[in-house]
From Swiss-Prot:
Protein name: Protein argonaute-3
Keyword Cell membrane: no
GO molecular function, one term: RNA endonuclease activity
Keywords: Cytoplasm, Developmental protein, Differentiation, Hydrolase, Methylation, Oogenesis, RNA-binding, RNA-mediated gene silencing, Spermatogenesis
SMART domains referenced in this protein's UniProt entry, alphabetically: PAZ, Piwi
E.C. designation(s): 3.1.26.-
Gene field: AGO3
Tissue expression remark: In ovary, expressed in germline stem cells, germline cyst cells, nurse cells and oocytes during early stages. Also found in the somatic cap cells of the germarium. In testis, expressed in germline stem cells, primary gonial cells and early spermatocytes. No expression detected in the somatic hub cells at the apical tip of the testis (at protein level). Expressed in neurons throughout the adult brain and in the mushroom body subdivision in the peduncle. In the mushroom body, expressed only in gamma and core alpha-beta neurons.
A cellular component annotation (GO) from this entry: perinuclear region of cytoplasm
Traits of the deletion mutant: Female sterility. Male semi-sterility accompanied by production of Ste protein crystals in primary spermatocytes. Mutant males fail to maintain germline stem cells.
Matching Pfam families: PAZ (PF02170), Piwi (PF02171), Piwi_N (PF23278)
Compartments (UniProt record): Cytoplasm; Cytoplasm, Perinuclear region; Cytoplasm, Cytoplasmic ribonucleoprotein granule
One Gene Ontology biological process: piRNA processing
């Protein structure tokens, strides 16, 4: 254990303050929502700060029989007694060593898989009071969720009929139930193990047998509890969009843009270390006040020839709302060969859409020549028996939801929208209290919860957290404190970079009328380079007469030589097709670092200096240089990041990006991307990328790493089993038994919010705040980390799930390392929300998936060419 303790001490300024790293312990309701092998000078500087790397080697001798962190996930509502797809383990029950204390907490094999019976907490850092957006749920011991199997004699295939006949006896079942056609859930225990009812079905006597199976454990009931809260929100007259609920009675109007913002909530019930709780966060939905028909008319007037193609491109895949029933539908297609006068079948015969809407909704269709919107929905019931329900909707009755591309690109409009959607910590707490009051003061909502023995309390959202120490940032010759704000932008542009690559052979391509902008760029670059320690020579200037894409392509092909280090393109404006064409040439056809600059950013005399400073920093990274680092006292450890990109249209390829550190200061990265032919999050080709990265690490360092830490982004809770059983073994096959792996899933899209301060005045926690108790999952090794400073709105923490910790680092080291890595993203002189390796993987995957759409030349793999 001494090796681990010595390593941990290097993370703290004062080793004498060390402690244990693991503790064993019409609607009127107000919503309340108004490449260089040599060691750089920066690395030598780290060595001079008493980094006793020889102590770290003792980590290699700390072993545990089974890898830590193999979390047993929460079963779904219909989990069988015997779970499938158990976590991989090579040891039997008898061979598992039981630890009684220390970081290698007890791990045992049970009938439900491998899990951690001990609570895994860190202890380093100063204690802080934290508030969270969780409400405690208590259960009535006299009630519960009782599982029954229902059989019909003679058998009935139709789920609809099964539900109908069982409903004939609902008064005998207590009036409250959940039934999917096979399994019945009741909040009461029936007096007999088997209960038999008789129903009449077309002169045939139908026997219904209800057989008691078991009382469900709390962790198996969370799906039901979430269904109950969906019913509660419906009682409160909220409209459901996906998993979120919105209040249509209090929209915030943006008249000039013809938009309205609906306030709402997103709720989720789960079992946490603090018990059964409801996570409740504020949410908003943007709704267009223009109908889809108005949008179609605009498109037709803009381009008659390509009208249908443009309409499908803009609308297919979007979600629309029909206000006559407040339901949402996804647009799967537009039927230009049909209109509202077309006939379709209903129970009473055939009717037209015009007649149907007049009869059932009292709506007069005005335009009888408009096309129809085609939508598909899955029917409810047993998944295996669900059918596709097809709908044809009327465009003049449909309203687009969400943010369109033209809205996102309008900065002024986005700032106006943010005035409604950017919610402060105090406002979130007020909204949480208002939600509790609305549920508590609505008898129908209380009846839904009470019938299942549930009650909501509002006294459990104060928890404890920890604040990590302030980090030191290391440049080539000096180190500076990042401060509590974890920002150091002034120091980043006034100190020599950690590793400098001088620029002597390079090209600037610009339009002829942007000659002055190119000259201004060069002059400001030379000024910026003086303080950054970078020498820059005059470039070859290439003037273009036209802004056509082929002009840039020809200029690149004609002027790039073997000695060219970098090419800079100054473009008239931002165009995705031009940008993609330039990147395809420079990343695949003629591999060379490239920088694309919008000429408008060079024409503001007040901002040009800061803009060019950032450009120089980017260019140094793309050339293979590094900007700064932090002290990470590991020896012979490789850190990796993984993320993926999916085509939003769901029809294109997917890209999986893999990034791995290749030097001891974690300032140089090997990057590789795999283009996949079908949409999948769990990547098949990771092992090949991993193997190449190991070879590159050995080439740079003379040996393979002893330990590997992998941060995996883009994985939800539902994919953790698959990740553990399918993705991690790919790395193990490459490593064998020689290298230990710690595998950490990084989750950004979460609804957890944490606040600091008193109950009266709440604010965002400072960077470095970690929470690993109370609101973490009951059966996972996980924690929440706030790494960014957010001055407007509410900060969103990042959720880390440790699936494996075979390196035996324990929670304190993993938490501290995760925070340190957030300082190393070179596009921002401060902390980012996730570790830099994941940010680099995200940038790489996005560039290839969005623009390049092909493999990148291996010559660029050791440079951050995608920044």
């Amino acid at each position: 254990m001494s090796g681990r303790g010595n390593l941990l001490s290097l993370f703290n300024k004062n080793a004498g303050n060390m402690g244990k790293s693991i503790s064993s312990k019409d609607h009127e309701i107000d919503s309340g929502l108004d490449f260089n092998n040599s060691e750089s000078s920066g690395e030598r500087l780290l060595s001079s700060h008493n980094i006793e790397t020889d102590l770290i080697t003792t980590l290699q001798h700390v072993n545990i029989s089974v890898g830590r962190g193999r979390a047993r996930l929460i079963d779904t509502l219909k989990t069988d007694d015997h779970t499938s797809n158990q976590f991989i383990t090579s040891e039997s029950k008898e061979n598992i060593t039981k630890k009684t204390k220390g970081p290698e907490s007890e791990a045992i094999a049970s009938e439900n898989g491998l899990f951690f019976p001990d609570l895994i907490y860190g202890s380093k850092g100063s204690s802080v009071n934290i508030y969270c957006n969780y409400l405690k749920l208590t259960t009535d011991e006299s009630k519960g969720v009782f599982n029954y199997e229902v059989r019909f004699f003679p058998p009935i295939d139709s789920v609809h009929l099964r539900i109908k006949y069982l409903n004939d006896h609902k008064d005998k079942l207590g009036g409250t139930k959940t039934f999917d056609g096979n399994t019945l859930y009741l909040p009461i225990l029936l007096p007999n193990k088997m209960t038999v009812f008789i129903s009449k079905a077309e002169d045939v006597e139908l026997q219904i047998r209800i057989l008691y199976k078991k009382k469900e454990e709390m962790r198996n009931c969370t799906q039901l509890y979430n269904i109950l809260f969906d019913r509660v929100m419906k009682v409160l007259n909220y409209v459901k969009f996906d998993r979120k609920q919105f209040d249509p009675s209090r929209p915030k109007i943006i008249p000039l843009a013809k938009l309205e913002v609906w306030p709402g909530y997103v709720t989720a019930v789960d079992e946490y270390k603090g018990g059964l709780m409801l996570c409740c966060d504020v949410s908003h939905r943007i709704l267009c006040q223009k109908t889809v028909l108005e949008m179609l008319v605009d498109l037709y007037q803009q381009n008659v020839e390509h009208y249908q193609e443009s309409a499908r491109k803009m609308l297919v895949g979007n979600i629309v709302l029909t206000r006559y029933n407040n339901r949402t539908y996804k647009i799967n297609d537009i039927c230009f060969d049909q209109n509202p006068t077309c006939q379709f079948e209903i129970k009473t015969g055939c009717t037209s859409y015009v007649e149907y809407y007049k009869q059932y909704h009292n709506i007069n269709i005005k335009d009888v020549n408009q096309p129809l919107i085609y939508s598909i929905k899955k029917s409810r019931g047993i998944p295996a028996e669900r059918e596709n329900l097809q709908f044809c909707l009327i465009p003049e009755l449909c309203y687009l939801t969400g943010l369109r591309d033209e809205v996102r690109s309008d900065n002024k409009l986005m700032r106006e929208i943010a005035t409604f959607t950017r919610v402060s910590p105090n406002q979130r707490q007020m909204a949480l209290n208002k939600f509790y009051e609305n549920v508590s003061n609505t008898p129908a909502a209380q009846e839904i919860l009470n019938s299942w023995g549930l009650s909501l309390t509002n006294n459990s959202n104060k928890i404890s957290g920890r604040q990590m120490d302030i980090e030191q940032i290391y440049f080539s010759k000096i180190s500076v404190s990042a401060g509590r704000s974890a920002e150091f932008s002034k120091h980043a542009v006034t100190n020599e970079m950690l590793k400098v690559v001088h620029l002597s052979k390079w090209i600037i391509i610009h339009l002829r009328n942007y000659r002055q902008a190119a000259t201004s760029l060069l002059d400001n670059m030379k000024q910026a380079c003086e303080s950054l320690g970078m020498n820059i020579s005059n470039p070859t200037m290439i003037s273009l007469d036209h802004d056509r894409i082929d002009a840039y392509i020809q200029a690149l092909r004609r002027n790039i030589t073997m000695n060219t280090q970098m090419v800079v393109c100054i473009c008239h404006n931002r165009r995705d097709d031009r940008y993609a064409a330039i990147k395809k040439i420079c990343c695949s056809e003629i591999p060379i670092p490239s920088q694309v600059i919008n000429a408008k950013t060079l024409q503001n005399d007040l901002k040009i200096r800061s803009v060019v400073q950032k450009i120089v920093l980017q260019m140094n990274c793309k050339l293979g240089g590094s900007l700064w680092t932090v002290k990470i006292p590991f020896k012979n450890v490789m850190i990796c990041g993984i993320d993926s990109y999916h085509d939003p249209s769901n029809r294109g390829n997917s890209v999986a990006a893999f990034v791995a550190s290749i030097n001891s200061s974690y300032s140089q990265w090997y990057s590789k991307a795999v283009v996949q032919t079908k949409r999948e999050e769990i990547v098949n080709g990771l092992s090949a990328s991993f193997e190449i990265a190991l070879k590159m690490y050995r080439k740079r360092n003379g040996k393979l790493p002893t330990n590997i830490i992998i941060y995996r982004d883009g994985i939800g809770d539902g994919q953790l089993y698959t990740c553990l059983n399918y993705e991690i073994p790919q790395f193990e096959m490459v490593c064998g038994n020689r290298i230990k792996i710690s595998y950490i899933v990084v989750q950004k899209r979460i609804n957890t919010r944490i606040f600091s301060g008193s109950g009266i005045h709440l604010e965002n926690p400072l960077p470095g705040t970690v929470v690993d108790q109370h609101i973490t999952k009951s059966n996972m090794y996980d924690f929440f980390l706030v790494s960014q400073l957010v001055r407007q709105g509410t900060v969103t923490p990042t959720h880390y799930v440790v699936l494996r910790d075979d390196c035996n680092y324990g929670p304190d080291i993993i938490q501290k390392l995760s925070y340190k890595l957030c300082f190393l993203y070179y596009n921002w002189a401060g902390t980012v929300r996730i570790p830099a390796c994941c940010m680099y993987a995200h940038k790489l995957a996005y560039l290839i998936g969005q623009s390049i759409q092909r493999d990148v030349a291996e010559a660029l793999s050791e440079k951050l060419f995608y920044l």
